[in-house]
C-alpha cells in the first residue's frame, strides 16, 4: 500500500512540474498546484518517503493512518537539502504532497481502520488531521524559516481543504473533516523549532483564513453555498478547540482571548475570497 501511495505522489510531483500545473479540484477557480523540481530532485524526494516508511517498519502495513505521516516526514524532510531556490518553491512542493495524499484516500476506506481512529473522530477525519498536523509540524524540517510558517501553514490547509472532494468525501463528512484539519494545523504549531509565541497569533489567523478561503474550492455532490455558514463554524470551532492543546514557552490561558480573536479575524477576512455559485459574502 505504501509503495502505491508513494507512486501516486511521484506521479503528482511529475504532473505538476516543469511548467505544468493542475488544480486542487475540478472548479476552474480552485487553487493551482505546480512545482519546480527536476526529475532527479523528484526521485530524491520520493526515495526519502520510501526510506521513512521502511524505517518505521510499515512496508507491509495496510493502514493509511500509520503510513501517511511517515510519507510526509520523509518527503518534506528532504526538501531542505534537495536544492530548492527559495521558500515559495518549497511551499509549492508541500502543497503538491498534501493534495496527493488527500487524493490517495479516495476509494480506500478499507485502508482506514476504525481501530486507528482518534477518540471522537472517524478514521477519515483522523487521516486528514494527521496529514495536516504532520505537514505543519515538519515545515521547519522542509527548510522553512520561522518567518515562512504563517504563509506555509495557510497554504497547506487551503490545499487540504480544497482537495476534500478529490479525496472522495461525501457532503456529510465535510464538516467534521474541516474541524479536525484546522485543529491539526493549529495544535502542531508548537512542534516547529524556532517558532515563538509572538508569531502564534498571525499563524492562527493565516490557518483559519486559508481553510475558509478554500471552502469555495471543494467539489462535492450536495455541497453548496447554503452550507457555508456551517462550514465556517466548523473551521473556527476546530481552531478554537486546538488552542488548549498548544504548549509553548510564554503561552498560557492569558493568551486565549487574543488567540480566539485571531481565529475569528482569519475566518472573517477570508469570506470575500470564497468563490461559489449563489454565494454572497454579505450573507454570512
Residue ranges with predicted function:
Residues 1-284:
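Non-catalytic all-alpha helical scaffold/repeat segments
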Amino acid at each position: 500500500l505504501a509503495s502505491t501511495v508513494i507512486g501516486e505522489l511521484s506521479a503528482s510531483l511529475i504532473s505538476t512540474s516543469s511548467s505544468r500545473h493542475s488544480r486542487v479540484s475540478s472548479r476552474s477557480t480552485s487553487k493551482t498546484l505546480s512545482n519546480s523540481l527536476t526529475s532527479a530532485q523528484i526521485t530524491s524526494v520520493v526515495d526519502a518517503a520510501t526510506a521513512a516508511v521502511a524505517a518505521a517498519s510499515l512496508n507491509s502495513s495496510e493502514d493509511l493512518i500509520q503510513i501517511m505521516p511517515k510519507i510526509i516526514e520523509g518527503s518534506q524532510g528532504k526538501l531542505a537539502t534537495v536544492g530548492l531556490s527559495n521558500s515559495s518553491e518549497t511551499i509549492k512542493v508541500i502543497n503538491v504532497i498534501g493534495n496527493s495524499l488527500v487524493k490517495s484516500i479516495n476509494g480506500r476506506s478499507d485502508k482506514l481502520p476504525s481501530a486507528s481512529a482518534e477518540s471522537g473522530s472517524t478514521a477519515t477525519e483522523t487521516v486528514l488531521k494527521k496529514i495536516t498536523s504532520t505537514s505543519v509540524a515538519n515545515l521547519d524540517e522542509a527548510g522553512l524559516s520561522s518567518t515562512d510558517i504563517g504563509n506555509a501553514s495557510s497554504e497547506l490547509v487551503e490545499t487540504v481543504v480544497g482537495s476534500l472532494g478529490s479525496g472522495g468525501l461525501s457532503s456529510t463528512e465535510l464538516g467534521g473533516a474541516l474541524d479536525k484539519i484546522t485543529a491539526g494545523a493549529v495544535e502542531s504549531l508548537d512542534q516547529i523549532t524556532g517558532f515563538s509565541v509572538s508569531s502564534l497569533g498571525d499563524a492562527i489567523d493565516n490557518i483559519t483564513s486559508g481553510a475558509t478561503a478554500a471552502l469555495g474550492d471543494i467539489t462535492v455532490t450536495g455541497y453548496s453555498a447554503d452550507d457555508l455558514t456551517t462550514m465556517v463554524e466548523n473551521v473556527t470551532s476546530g481552531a478554537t478547540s486546538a488552542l488548549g492543546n498548544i504548549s509553548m514557552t510564554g503561552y498560557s490561558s492569558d493568551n486565549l482571548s487574543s488567540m480566539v480573536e485571531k481565529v475569528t479575524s482569519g475566518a472573517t477576512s477570508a469570506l470575500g475570497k470564497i468563490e461559489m455559485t449563489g454565494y454572497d459574502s454579505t450573507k454570512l
